[in-house]
Amino acid sequence: MTAKDVKFRDGARSQIVKGVNVLADAVKVTLGPKGRNVVIERSFGAPVITKDGVSVAKEIELKDRFENMGAQIVKQVASKTADVAGDGTTTATVLAQAIVQEGMKHVAAGMNPMDLKRGIDKAVGVVLEELRTLSRPISTHKEIAQVGAISANADDAIGKIIADAMEKVGKEGVITVEDGKSLDNELDVVEGMQFDRGYISPYFINDPEKQAAYLDDALILLHDKKISNIRDLLPILEAASKAGKPLLIVAEDVEAEALATLVVNAMRGILKVAAVKAPGFGDRRKAMLEDIAILTGATVISEETGKQLDKATLDDLGSAKRVEVRKDDTIIIDGAGDAARIDARVKSIRVQIDEATSDYDREKLQERVAKLAGGVAVIKVGAVTEVEMKEKKDRVDDALHATRAAVEEGIVPGGGVALLRARAALTDLKGANGDQDAGIRIVLRALEAPLRVIASNAGDEPSVVIAKVLEGSGNFGYNAATGEYGDLVEAGVVDPTKVTRTALQNAASIAGLVLTTDATVADAPKDERAEAAPSPELGY
């Protein structure tokens, strides 16, 4: 077993605090509209230039093992905040550093760390309630664009494209971010349900120019097994032909005689038809077939529902205004499903999302919700160089998460003002003893930290800015982008309540752990000279 190096009390805490400060000082330069860039070396290729706090945090590993513990603890604050709220990582890091630094002064003065933590937790609980009071809901295109712009380091173009995407696919729709092929940002929207399976045979194509099969006012047959015998399909084919409507067949596979007959019918123009494989595998395939069934008003023909293909009727088929089938994907637009059943299905999948343990499962379930509830929008990020593309994509991603958070829980005045205003709720708050009161005062002081850093990064004197903001009330604050004071909500300087709340919660949680740490254990450094010494038996 490797020998361990153990440090106790002040020796343990001081090394951890050094690590906290190194990481926080590197991250906090990115805070605010006038935040500075951080250049990160890469083993291969050009360095990365970023203003994204969590990207900076993830890169930091310190040589000293004990200091590195502190850095990794604060890195957890940034990562957890990013996971829950998608933004606010830099604010969380700044708050954590402020609480740790203030707390360490009191611990050094001989106060009880556990009582300090109780006071901190009590104060944070009150501040969170105050933030909910300050919060207001958002819904308009302009408000959504403002939140997106702020989170993308004051980039109005990014805010606008995110607001456009949300308007197109709804607040539940999937919005993905990809590399663009031009210099400008572009928005592509896929309406309806899209899944990644294309036509089984290219002979189903009815638009040679676009290499696709388009079926208008189509009937849709869903089957969870392979179809190889044409006799099983005949009743449905005859019914579709009599109804004079095109037919989309979604099955595990269509092969042999059945496929040949469908191809001949399509080529001769007897029946407009296209066949595609069902999306997904195993249980996920069954669930997705059921999603399509609910969206289109169909019944899945399967043993589980007691339905047989040769006994299927027109009542078992779904329908959609338009179906587009390409080589690799199929889009069902404007399905005829019952709205109440679609809503119930979405709610059911949301419950599964809350219970999902793996990120992969959660992501796939969210995609299913989006396909049922709205659609899919793709933001293609344009840039001149690859370095700029990476930096811009990080900002778009942050802005997207922040905007979703704002729609979910509302907004508060930005620029660190909401936290400053929330301090009013702590004025009369008392703990059970003097040490807990000190814990409350630690939070009171730490709530200034984000505004101090924003002002400092903008080249202004933090104490002067804070004094000026405290003279006003409500939404009155400091707009670092313009250097002016005024109503921040009017000026579009807002933060999602969820982001501010999560940042404070995580910062206080981790800072409390640092303050109550009394011992640290790390691998002892290896004695390289002893390892390099030659063996005397070898006769050197």
Curated annotation (Swiss-Prot):
- Give UniProt keywords alphabetically: ATP-binding, Chaperone, Cytoplasm, Isomerase, Nucleotide-binding
* A biological-process GO annotation: protein refolding
Q: Which GO terms describe its cellular component?
A: cytoplasm
The record's section on CDD domains has: GroEL (cd03344)
Spell out the coiled coil positions from the record: none
Could you tell me which PROSITE patterns the record lists for this protein? CHAPERONINS_CPN60 (PS00296)
Q: Which residues bind ATP?
A: 30-33, 51, 87-91, 415, 479-481, 495
Which SUPFAM superfamilies does the UniProt entry name for this protein?
Answer: GroEL apical domain-like, GroEL equatorial domain-like, GroEL-intermediate domain like
What molecular function terms (GO) are annotated for this protein? ATP binding; ATP-dependent protein folding chaperone; isomerase activity; unfolded protein binding
Q: Where in the cell is it found?
A: Cytoplasm
UniProt keyword Nucleotide-binding present? yes
InterPro entries documented for this protein? Chaperonin_Cpn60_CS (IPR018370), Cpn60/GroEL (IPR001844), Cpn60/GroEL/TCP-1 (IPR002423), GroEL-like_apical_dom_sf (IPR027409), GROEL-like_equatorial_sf (IPR027413), TCP-1-like_intermed_sf (IPR027410)
- State a single Pfam family of this protein: Cpn60_TCP1
State the reactions this protein catalyses.
ATP + H2O + a folded polypeptide = ADP + phosphate + an unfolded polypeptide
Instruction: Please describe what this protein does.
Output: Together with its co-chaperonin GroES, plays an essential role in assisting protein folding. The GroEL-GroES system forms a nano-cage that allows encapsulation of the non-native substrate proteins and provides a physical environment optimized to promote and accelerate protein folding.
Assembly and interaction partners: Forms a cylinder of 14 subunits composed of two heptameric rings stacked back-to-back. Interacts with the co-chaperonin GroES.
Family per similarity comment: Belongs to the chaperonin (HSP60) family.
Descriptive protein name: Chaperonin GroEL 2
> Gene that codes for this?
groEL2
